[in-house]
C-alpha cells in the first residue's frame, strides 16, 4: 500500500509496456515514503547505497527509458551528502529525492543547509515527496487527499520563508503532491 492505495507489481518490462501504451518516452525511478532511514544512520547508508546501485543498473540496462533520482539518508546529513556525491559521480543519478519531512523536521530547517549547499553546487534536481505523517490522519479521509499535499506544501513554504531558495538558487526543485 502507498498512502492507502494498492500498488501494482512492478517490473521493468511491465513499466516499459505501460510507457509505450501511454505514449510516454521515459520515466524517472525513485523510492518514496518512508525512505531508507528507519532510525539507524549506518543501516540507512547501507540501504541507500544498495537501492541506488540497483536503480542505476536498471537505468544502465534501459538508458533510453529510465532515469533515476537517488535516495538519500536524511536526517543523517553527512550520509546524505556522501551518498549524493556517490550517486551523481559514479552512478549517474539525474537528481535526488528528498522527503518533505523527516524525524519531525521539514526541508527548510537549518540542519539541512549543508546538504542544500552540496546539492546547489551541482545545480541538482531535487524532487520533494511527502514524508511519513507526523500525526494521525483524519479518519475517513485518505492521506493522499489532503495530508500529502500539506506536507510538501509546508516544506516548500518553509524553504522559501527560511531563505533556502535565496541561499541555494541553483537547486532545481520539483514538488510532488503540493498545492
Task: Say what each PLM segment does.
Residues 1-179:
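Helix-coil boundary/capping segments in enzymes
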Amino acid at each position: 500500500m502507498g498512502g492507502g492505495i494498492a500498488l501494482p507489481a512492478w517490473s521493468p518490462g511491465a513499466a516499459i509496456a505501460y510507457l509505450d501504451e501511454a505514449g510516454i518516452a521515459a520515466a524517472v525511478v525513485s523510492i518514496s515514503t518512508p525512505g531508507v532511514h528507519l532510525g539507524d544512520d549506518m543501516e540507512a547508508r547501507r540501504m541507500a547505497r544498495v537501492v541506488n546501485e540497483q536503480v542505476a543498473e536498471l537505468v544502465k540496462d534501459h538508458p533510453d527509458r529510465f532515469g533515476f533520482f537517488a535516495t538519500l539518508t536524511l536526517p543523517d546529513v553527512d550520509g546524505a551528502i556522501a551518498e549524493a556525491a556517490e550517486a551523481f559521480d559514479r552512478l549517474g543519478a539525474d537528481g535526488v529525492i528528498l522527503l518533505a519531512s523527516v524525524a519531525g523536521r521539514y526541508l527548510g530547517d537549518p540542519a539541512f543547509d549543508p546538504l542544500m549547499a552540496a546539492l546547489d553546487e551541482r545545480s541538482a534536481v531535487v524532487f520533494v515527496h511527502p514524508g511519513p505523517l507526523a500525526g494521525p490522519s483524519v479518519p475517513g479521509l485518505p492521506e493522499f487527499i489532503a495530508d500529502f499535499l500539506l506536507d510538501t506544501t509546508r516544506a516548500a513554504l518553509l524553504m522559501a520563508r527560511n531563505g533556502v531558495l535565496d541561499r541555494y538558487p541553483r537547486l532545481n526543485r520539483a514538488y510532488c503532491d503540493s498545492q
